Every structure is written in structure tokens, then in C-alpha cells.
């Protein structure tokens, strides 16, 4: 297969679709953040998938940004960098949850409990130092990145505009999470997951359209112009 910008954009669209569906779907099967669950197979599978979601999401938003880099301007760049940093944070956090927490749960359950408290929204007690600021940092870049990138998409008029609005609104809605239990608040991810998948589909469709032979151009192997 020949590697072209069109093919890469299409692949980024598929990556974003997959990442969005994973982000939303994981919320329904995520085990409760308790030490007893950390060594189970369900915990491992969910966090392997979350690492994959982070990698695919990073590839997806990169393709989205490059598709509309001129139209989104500085606002789009800011949103892309913030969301990219969010996905990198997700990858790092999920790696810890998948590969570091299970041994800790057996050998040092009190430390595993403290780490789960950070990721689960429990109040920090200072025992883990700077690590306790991860949840606040992740919230900030998620909120600001989703808002700015979503608005930039809407203004650019290149990809699905209402998907951009859904991304912005879903990201901003996380400000209400302190009002709900963590098990309920995690479903605030659904609008963002849908928006990312929607934008990925929009990117994929637009890539297929622009990648098609233009009207009246010669198609390789046919020897003459073919009207589209």
C-alpha cells in the first residue's frame, strides 16, 4: 500500500472512531477502584484497553488537527496540544494501573489504596507527594483542551461542526463532577467519547472524498479520463 497524506488521514479517522468508542464503552465495564479488584482479569483488560484508547486518541486528534491546521489557527493549536497532553497522561496513568498496581496490591496494599484514591477522586493526604496532583492536572487539560479544540473545530467548518460543540460541552460538563459520586460521574465521558468518534468519522469521510479521483482526471491503469 502506498503511504499518502490521504491514507494517513483516513487511518487517523479510524483511530479516533475506535478511541471514542473505547472511551465511552470502558465506562460501563470499569471495575470499582478497590484493591480487591486490582489483581483481577477485568481490571487488567480494562486498563490495557485504556492504554490503547490513549494511543489511538492521540493519533486521531493529530489527524484532525492536521486536516484543519490553517483554519483552526492558534485556538486549534492550543486545543490540540492540551488534548495531546491529556492523552499522554491517560497512557501514563493507565500503564501504572495496569502494570504497577497489581504487584503493589499484593505487596503494599496501603500504597495501592492511596494511588487508587487519587485516580478515583478521593481526597489527597500528602503521602504520595506530587503524584497527588495528577488528577487536578488531568482535569485542567481535559477541560481546557476539549473546550478550545471543540470551539476551533466548530469555527473551522472543516469537520462536523456539531461534533466540535459536543466535544466542548462534554469537556465543560466535567466541572459538575464533584456533585456526583465517582461511579456516576465517570459517565460524563460519554459525550466526549461520542464527539471524538463522530469527528473521527467526519475525518474519514472527508478523506475518502478528497482522495477520490477528480472529475475528468485520468485514472491510473485505464489510459483515459473518466468522468466522475
Q: What residue ranges belong to the model's regions?
A:
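Hydrophobic, aromatic-enriched alpha-helical segments typical of multi-pass transmembrane helices
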Residues: 1-228
Amino acid at each position: 500500500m502506498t503511504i499518502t497524506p490521504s491514507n494517513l488521514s483516513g487511518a487517523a479517522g479510524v483511530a479516533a472512531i475506535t478511541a471514542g468508542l473505547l472511551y465511552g464503552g470502558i465506562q460501563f465495564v470499569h471495575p470499582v477502584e478497590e484493591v480487591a479488584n486490582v489483581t483481577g482479569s477485568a481490571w487488567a483488560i480494562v486498563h490495557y484497553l485504556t492504554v490503547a484508547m490513549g494511543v489511538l486518541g492521540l493519533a486521531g486528534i493529530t489527524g484532525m488537527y492536521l486536516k484543519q491546521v490553517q483554519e483552526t489557527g492558534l485556538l486549534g493549536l492550543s486545543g490540540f496540544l492540551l488534548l495531546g497532553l491529556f492523552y499522554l497522561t491517560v497512557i501514563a496513568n493507565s500503564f501504572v494501573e495496569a502494570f504497577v498496581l497489581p504487584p503493589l496490591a499484593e505487596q503494599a496494599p496501603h500504597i495501592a489504596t492511596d494511588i487508587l484514591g487519587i485516580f478515583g477522586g478521593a481526597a489527597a493526604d500528602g503521602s504520595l507527594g506530587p503524584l497527588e496532583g495528577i488528577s487536578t492536572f488531568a482535569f485542567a487539560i481535559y477541560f481546557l483542551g476539549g473546550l478550545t479544540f471543540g470551539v476551533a473545530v466548530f469555527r473551522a467548518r472543516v469537520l462536523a461542526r456539531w461534533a466540535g460543540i459536543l466535544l466542548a460541552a462534554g469537556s465543560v460538563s466535567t466541572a459538575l463532577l464533584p456533585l456526583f459520586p465517582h461511579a456516576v460521574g465517570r459517565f460524563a465521558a460519554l459525550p466526549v467519547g461520542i464527539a471524538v468518534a463522530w469527528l473521527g468519522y467526519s475525518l474519514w469521510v472527508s478523506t475518502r472524498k478528497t482522495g477520490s479521483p477528480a472529475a475528468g482526471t485520468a485514472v491510473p491503469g485505464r489510459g483515459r479520463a473518466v468522468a466522475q
